[in-house]
C-alpha cells in the first residue's frame, strides 16, 4: 500500500521508481515520522483557540492507522477531539473533494492548510473560508485563499 502511494505520487510528476526504491523511501519516511513535532508557534495558536473555546478539527488524507499515529506523535489530542478528526480512508472522501468538507455541518469554519491543490481548492469548492500556509512561496492559480 505505502509503496504504491509513493509510486503514484511521483508518477504525477512524471517520475517513476521501482518497488525496491519505493520501499527504501518508505523505510526512511517511517524513521523520520518518528521525530515529527508540533512547532511552538502552532502550539501557541492551538492553545489560544482552545482557551477561547474555538473549535478545532482536522481533515486529512491517508490511511487511518498512519494518520492517527502522526496525530498521536504531534499530540493533537491536546487540542482536537477524536470526533472532530476526518480521515479520508475512514469517511470515504479525500481532499480536494468538497464532500469531505461537507461532512462538517458547522459552516462557520476557516480551513487552514498547506497544500494549494488539496486544501485551498477543496475548501473553496466547499464554500469555506481558507487560509493557505504557503511555506514554499508558490503562486495561487485561479482559486484564491482568503
Language-model-derived ranges and their functions:
Residues 3, 19, 30-57:
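Short, acidic loop-to-helix structural element flanking the phosphoryl-transfer center
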Residues 1-26:
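A metal-dependent, Asp-based hydrolase signature
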Residues 4-8, 28, 44, 99, ...:
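Alpha-helical elements of Rossmann-like donor-binding domains used by nucleotide-donor carbohydrate transfer enzymes
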Residues 15-16, 36, 94:
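Helix-turn-helix-type domain boundary/helix-start signal
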Residues 9-13, 32, 88:
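Alpha-helix C-capping/helix-to-loop hinge sites
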Residues 47, 63-146:
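Asp-based, Mg2+/Mn2+-dependent phosphohydrolase catalytic module
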Residues 60:
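Conserved phosphate-coupling serine/threonine residues in phosphotransfer and NTP-handling enzymes
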Amino acid at each position: 500500500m505505502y509503496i504504491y502511494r509513493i509510486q503514484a505520487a511521483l508518477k504525477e510528476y512524471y517520475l517513476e521508481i521501482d518497488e525496491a526504491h519505493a520501499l527504501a523511501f518508505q523505510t526512511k519516511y517511517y524513521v523520520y515520522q518518528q521525530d515529527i513535532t508540533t512547532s511552538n508557534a502552532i502550539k501557541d495558536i492551538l492553545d489560544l483557540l482552545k482557551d477561547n473555546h474555538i473549535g478545532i478539527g482536522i481533515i486529512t488524507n491517508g490511511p487511518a492507522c498512519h494518520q492517527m499515529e502522526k496525530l498521536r506523535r504531534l499530540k493533537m489530542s491536546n487540542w482536537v477531539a477524536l470526533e472532530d478528526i476526518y480521515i479520508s480512508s475512514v469517511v470515504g472522501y479525500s481532499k480536494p473533494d468538497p464532500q469531505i468538507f461537507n461532512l462538517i455541518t458547522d459552516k462557520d469554519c476557516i480551513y487552514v492548510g498547506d497544500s494549494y491543490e488539496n486544501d485551498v481548492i477543496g475548501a473553496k469548492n466547499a464554500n469555506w473560508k481558507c487560509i493557505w500556509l504557503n511555506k514554499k512561496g508558490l503562486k495561487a492559480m485561479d482559486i484564491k485563499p482568503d
